[in-house]
Design a protein with these regions (language model features):
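Long terminal segments
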Residues: 191-265
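N-terminal, Lys/Arg-enriched amphipathic/low-complexity engagement segments
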Residues: 20-69, 77
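Short, small-residue-biased leader/transition segments that mark boundaries at the very start
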Residues: 1-3
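The right-handed parallel beta-helix/beta-solenoid scaffold, focusing on the short coil/turn
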Residues: 47-49, 57-59, 67, 77-79, ...
Length: 265
């Protein structure tokens, strides 16, 4: 057997073809050290993998490409860091630094996510059903057709989009009705990209002077419609109803909003 599927923490196959090779391999994380678990994932020849009993192991799917991975449990920090083309689905919550420097692919989280989600993200899509912690989308950046997207179904903590340089951050606030779905100091140091907040409430008073806010028009809603529909399809929501609501957009107010901070020649 090329992958030792029947021993050392690998469960029996759920389904198989004529020669006995299963369509989806299952790996039990349990109390395995993260290095051992990640080695099994990285060397597995199968295109589809299910991870069972995941409990805090770090760096899962780090730099991985070309696979579909389903995670049962709670992965540790830096899930999908440097991800390069995988489809990863977490049936639970995730912790900090999820999607750190993610390059491409899709990460879906059926729960909440911790701090610094999408740190330095430069491509791909992260879909979070629930809330996200502090500093989500910090240092996000885009280049030509590489445009990162972070969609949050609930609300975001403070310092959302800190130093954002590109891409889209979309916070839907589906569980928030009496306040904007964002914490203190959103868009601090923002100099590129866009933040969309679905809300009828006033914006926080501490948006930086270098950042402008306005109500999204139809053209701007059309920009994010594909991402909202992708989110709605994953989590069973009504995309048309979401897009019909009011969105506020945060954008930097010039190509160099921090000119006054530097000495000019």
């Amino acid at each position: 057997d090329v992958y030792k599927r029947q021993i050392d923490g690998v469960l029996p196959p759920r389904s198989g073809d004529a020669d006995g090779r299963e369509q989806t391999v299952r790996i039990v994380a349990g109390d395995k050290h993260f290095r051992e678990l990640n080695e099994e994932i990285n060397t597995c020849p199968d295109a589809e993998i299910e991870l069972d009993n995941v409990c805090g192991q770090r760096y899962i799917c780090s730099g991985l490409s070309g696979k579909k991975v389903t995670i049962h449990g709670i992965p540790g920090n830096a899930l999908c860091c440097y991800l390069d083309g995988c489809d990863v689905e977490v049936l639970g919550n995730a912790q900090d630094a999820t999607g750190d420097t993610m390059n491409s692919g899709t990460l879906t989280i059926h729960g909440h996510c911790g701090d610094a989600t999408g740190y330095a993200m430069r491509g791909g899509t992260i879909l979070i059903e629930g809330n996200v912690g502090y500093r989500a989308g910090i240092h996000m950046k885009a280049y030509q057709t590489h445009i990162p997207v972070l969609v949050v179904g609930g609300e975001a903590g403070s310092f959302l989009g800190e130093y954002q340089a590109g891409g889209y951050i979309i916070v839907l606030g589906l569980n928030t009705h009496d306040h904007a779905p964002v914490g203190r100091f959103p868009a601090a140091g923002m100099h590129g990209g866009k933040i969309f907040l679905r809300t009828d409430c006033d914006m926080p008073f501490d948006i930086p002077a270098q950042v402008l806010s306005h109500e999204a028009d139809d053209a701007e809603k059309a920009e994010i419609a594909p991402f909202v529909r992708q989110f709605a399809e994953k989590f069973g929501k009504d995309a048309d109803a979401i897009l019909a609501d009011r969105f506020v957009v945060l954008v930097p107010d010039s190509a160099n909003p921090y000119r006054s901070m530097y000495v000019t020649n």
